[in-house]
Amino acid sequence: MSYGFVAYNLPKVQGTYRRGVKMHNATWFNVGGVAEVVFKPSSVEDLAAFVRDTNLPISVVGVASNLIVRDGIVKGVVVKLGREFSYINCNGNIITAGCATLLSNLAVAAQESGISGLEFFVGIPGTVGGAIEMNAGAYGGDVASVLRSVRAVNEHGEICTLSNDDMRYSYREHGLVGKWIFVDATFVGACGDRDAIKGTMREFIARRNDSQPVRGRTGGSTFKNPEGHQAWELIDKAGCRGLQIGGAQVSEKHCNFLLNCGGATAKDLEDLGNEIRCRVHSMFGIKLEWEIRFLGCGL
């Protein structure tokens, strides 16, 4: 397929630009079109200068574990934080991590430092930045319960430090106004026993492996749980377990997970999700909200 890219005049940066990047290789679903430009900043200051000096649309991608990139073009610039933003520092019961850090690595570092309260991160695929963006949570814990502060670049290219209260968290979202790129976060846990923390983490991993299609090409939880309900139960009762459109299928193991069973397009996945929403709404009068995020344009 031929894509008509715009020859953008990009700001000078210390990091790197790549043009015409095929996004399907970067997503857990293994679907998606082409990004016009991907930018990897070399530092927070480099990122801030880029934001100040461009008027192009900006989107941010981590490891794309809870993201469907549509089949067409992702316009503008996709910011991808690299290894310069993957670090962990522990001090007592406080732990700071760059936003490209994997959540599983954060959980392990906390355990090794005897910091409890962050065990739930071990079962969540994704990065610290993605978790901050959507108030990720599992097994009774979430970002809002352990976050102390987050450093971010706002849409004006200013580097800001935001408190937990500033984030105005609610279920699977924050309440910030405007566009933000999170660069690192500081969490507070409690002093705990390393062996006990490791035991809890092993339990969470076992529960995840037993209940979720961890070996499939999936993107994590598809829909938010409506108040008073479990999304998977509504989906199951609406007759959607195993439902398939094209190469996309509702997981037989956990109904709130979609799978790329081979050859699926982003449109297959989105159409399947919308079919689920229609069936659940028709049967229960409940509108399921996407937890998975979308990026880019369809064909």
Swiss-Prot record:
Residue intervals of the FAD-binding PCMH-type domain: 31-192
Gene3D superfamilies noted in UniProt: 3.30.465.10, UDP-N-acetylenolpyruvoylglucosamine reductase, C-terminal domain, Uridine Diphospho-n-acetylenolpyruvylglucosamine Reductase, domain 2
Superkingdom classification of source: Bacteria
Residues at the catalytic site: 172, 221 (proton donor), 291
GO molecular function: FAD binding; UDP-N-acetylmuramate dehydrogenase activity
Catalytic activity: UDP-N-acetyl-alpha-D-muramate + NADP(+) = UDP-N-acetyl-3-O-(1-carboxyvinyl)-alpha-D-glucosamine + NADPH + H(+)
Main localization, broad class: cytoplasm
UniProt cross-references to PROSITE patterns, sorted A to Z: FAD_PCMH
Disulfide bonds: none
Pathway listed: Cell wall biogenesis; peptidoglycan biosynthesis
Example of a GO biological process term: peptidoglycan biosynthetic process
Location(s), subcellular: Cytoplasm
Keyword annotations of the record: Cell cycle, Cell division, Cell shape, Cell wall biogenesis/degradation, Cytoplasm, FAD, Flavoprotein, NADP, Oxidoreductase, Peptidoglycan synthesis
EC number: 1.3.1.98
Pfam families the record matches: FAD_binding_4, MurB_C
Cofactor(s) demanded: FAD
One cellular component term from this protein's GO annotations in UniProt: cytosol
Job of this protein: Cell wall formation.
HAMAP family reported for this sequence: MurB (MF_00037)
Family to which the UniProt record says this protein belongs: Belongs to the MurB family.
Protein name: UDP-N-acetylenolpyruvoylglucosamine reductase
Gene it is expressed from: murB
